Swiss-Prot record:
<feature type="region of interest" description="Domain II">
    <location>
        <begin position="83"/>
        <end position="128"/>
    </location>
</feature>
<dbReference type="Pfam" id="PF11638">
    <property type="entry name" value="DnaA_N"/>
</dbReference>
<comment type="similarity">
    <text>Belongs to the DnaA family.</text>
</comment>
<feature type="region of interest" description="Domain IV, binds dsDNA">
    <location>
        <begin position="345"/>
        <end position="469"/>
    </location>
</feature>
<comment type="function">
    <text>Plays an essential role in the initiation and regulation of chromosomal replication. ATP-DnaA binds to the origin of replication (oriC) to initiate formation of the DNA replication initiation complex once per cell cycle. Binds the DnaA box (a 9 base pair repeat at the origin) and separates the double-stranded (ds)DNA. Forms a right-handed helical filament on oriC DNA; dsDNA binds to the exterior of the filament while single-stranded (ss)DNA is stabiized in the filament's interior.</text>
</comment>
<dbReference type="GO" id="GO:0005737">
    <property type="term" value="C:cytoplasm"/>
</dbReference>
<feature type="binding site">
    <location>
        <position position="175"/>
    </location>
    <ligand>
        <name>ATP</name>
    </ligand>
</feature>
<keyword id="KW-0235">DNA replication</keyword>
<feature type="region of interest" description="Domain III, AAA+ region">
    <location>
        <begin position="129"/>
        <end position="344"/>
    </location>
</feature>
<protein>
    <recommendedName>
        <fullName>Chromosomal replication initiator protein DnaA</fullName>
    </recommendedName>
</protein>
<feature type="binding site">
    <location>
        <position position="176"/>
    </location>
    <ligand>
        <name>ATP</name>
    </ligand>
</feature>
<dbReference type="GO" id="GO:0016887">
    <property type="term" value="F:ATP hydrolysis activity"/>
</dbReference>
<dbReference type="GO" id="GO:0005524">
    <property type="term" value="F:ATP binding"/>
</dbReference>
<dbReference type="InterPro" id="IPR027417">
    <property type="entry name" value="P-loop_NTPase"/>
</dbReference>
<dbReference type="Pfam" id="PF08299">
    <property type="entry name" value="Bac_DnaA_C"/>
</dbReference>
<dbReference type="GO" id="GO:0008289">
    <property type="term" value="F:lipid binding"/>
</dbReference>
<dbReference type="InterPro" id="IPR038454">
    <property type="entry name" value="DnaA_N_sf"/>
</dbReference>
Length: 469
């Protein structure tokens, strides 16, 4: 089979995936994956990063190989070449890929090696306002943030075209700033685009100072000439009428020029108070994604990832202790891990369980929420959908009952430490595979339906409020 034949089969596979997949998924993963070359029975695709490659291998490699077999009648393997996009590539429309021009290169995962290797596209060096350790490779992905991470990668791969504006919201310490700056770092490292990162507070302070010093032309020029504008913590703009007015006009000018705009917020835009409706509508115009509290397994993985950066290693039993007792956010997980590492390094003593619990008692005490029970979640979901708890636990399969039941399963798995077997017992004697199926079903629907994401967010808030009563 000639290389041309392999290319034809790949192009046809892409066309079929375009018909079969949601456009958001197709544009996120298949448009940036480009045919590079082929050898006997292997097709090589270029992808923009190591993280992107790993996700393609995990989620799509088997499906692609199956599709190629169906088309060609031969077993064809897929392999990946990492080629960070050039600015020329990024300027092309979503329906056209173009060829990459850089040599194969994988991004280093550590902040130190990243600092040494970011001289790309003209040797600009590290962005002065972005932290190098905030990159996609160091971001632990799980069901609580998978949709947001995938969308962020799409934005960084095709700024101004994929999702614009792009807004990331969620509670304190869940990775909003990390994800935003990862977008900025990726674009800065791989293109010549002008990237501006600013907190909403600093934007406001700078605006006030420029008004007082009659320097507004310079202020407008700075922000309206950005190719990528990243504004962190936009909830700070609440009640800042004049700043909102300036941001509104800055937004419009950048949006009309197809410049990428990214925001973070501690809540959905609809819940912001004292914010002009027209600005709120701008925030909601593009894609809004919610970063949720990580489940136990993801908290454990985050701690292991953080520990990679330290020479001192903490025994897994204490990592498990932290993951089980700190469920609030990533920042608190880091604080607990840092305390254990500091004790080990400074005292040179072997840590035992009693010592670890004593060291972390303040963190455990301040972050542990009052118990969220299965019963509370079931009651909250039942009330929301105007059904009874017995309906939630019943074997009824009509959608009016099965859908709320699966949402309750999803929230129980996220907000409690109960095993799937325990959850099955409290959901009418179901086995653990039924619980997993229900949770997975909701995760898939959240990724495809933003309105469901809002329902989950509202239920989660109601449950948390009820635990504090």
């Amino acid at each position: 089979m000639s290389e041309w034949d392999y290319k034809i089969f790949w192009d046809e596979a892409v066309n079929q995936f375009k018909e079969e997949l949601a456009f958001s998924i197709f544009s996120m993963w298949f448009l940036p994956s480009k045919y590079e070359k082929s050898t006997e029975n292997t097709v090589y695709l270029s992808v923009p990063s190591k993280f992107f490659r790993d996700q393609m291998i995990h989620n799509y490699k088997n499906g692609i190989e199956k599709k190629l077999f169906e088309l060609s009648g031969k077993k064809i393997s897929i392999d990946f070449i990492i080629k960070p996009n050039t600015s020329e590539d990024l300027s092309k429309a979503e329906n056209e890929g173009g060829n990459d021009k850089k040599e194969d290169a994988a991004k280093p995962s550590s902040a130190e090696s990243k600092k040494k290797s970011v001289k790309t596209e003209g040797g600009r060096g590290q962005h002065p306002d972005l932290r190098p350790e905030y990159n996609f490779e160091d971001f632990v992905v799980g069901p609580n943030n998978n949709f947001g991470v995938n969308a962020a990668i799409a934005v960084s791969t095709n700024p101004g075209s994929a999702y614009n504006p792009f807004l990331i919201y969620g509670g304190v310490g869940l990775g909003k700033t990390h994800l935003m700056q990862a977008i900025g770092n990726k674009i800065w490292d791989t293109t010549k685009l002008k990237v501006i990162y600013v907190t909403a507070e600093n934007f406001t302070n700078e605006f006030v100072e420029c008004v007082q010093k009659k320097m507004m032309p310079a202020f407008k020029s700075k922000y309206r000439k950005a190719d990528v504008l990243l504004i962190d913590d936009i909830h700070f703009f609440q009640g800042k009428v004049e700043t909102q007015e300036e941001l509104f006009h800055t937004f419009n000018e950048l949006y009309e020029k197809n410049k990428q705009i990214v925001f973070t917020c501690d809540r959905p835009p609809a819940e912001l108070k004292n914010l002009s409706q027209r600005l709120k509508s701008r925030f909601e115009r593009g894609l809004n994604v919610d970063l949720q509290t990580p489940a136990y397994e993801i908290r454990y993985a985050i701690l292991l990832k953080k520990m990679e950066k330290h020479s001192t290693k903490i025994p897994n039993e204490f990592i498990d202790m932290v993951a089980k007792n700190v469920s609030s956010n990533v920042r608190d997980l880091e604080a607990a891990l840092t305390k254990l590492i500091a004790y080990t390094e400074l005292t040179k003593k072997t840590m035992d369980e009693a010592t670890a619990k004593n060291l972390l008692r303040d963190i455990f005490g301040s972050t542990r929420q009052r118990n969220v029970t299965i019963d509370l979640i079931q009651r909250t979901v039942a009330d929301y959908f105007s059904i009874s708890i017995s309906d939630i636990k019943s074997k009824k399969r009509t959608k009016s009952f099965s859908f709320p039941r699966q949402i309750a399963m999803f929230l129980c798995r996220e907000m409690t430490e109960c095993s799937t077997t325990e959850l099955g017992n409290d959901f009418g004697g179901r086995d653990h595979t039924t619980i997993l199926h229900g949770c997975n079903k909701i995760e898939e629907q959240i990724a495809a339906d933003p309105s469901l994401e809002k329902i989950i967010h509202e239920l989660r808030n109601t449950i948390k409020e009820n635990t504090n009563k």
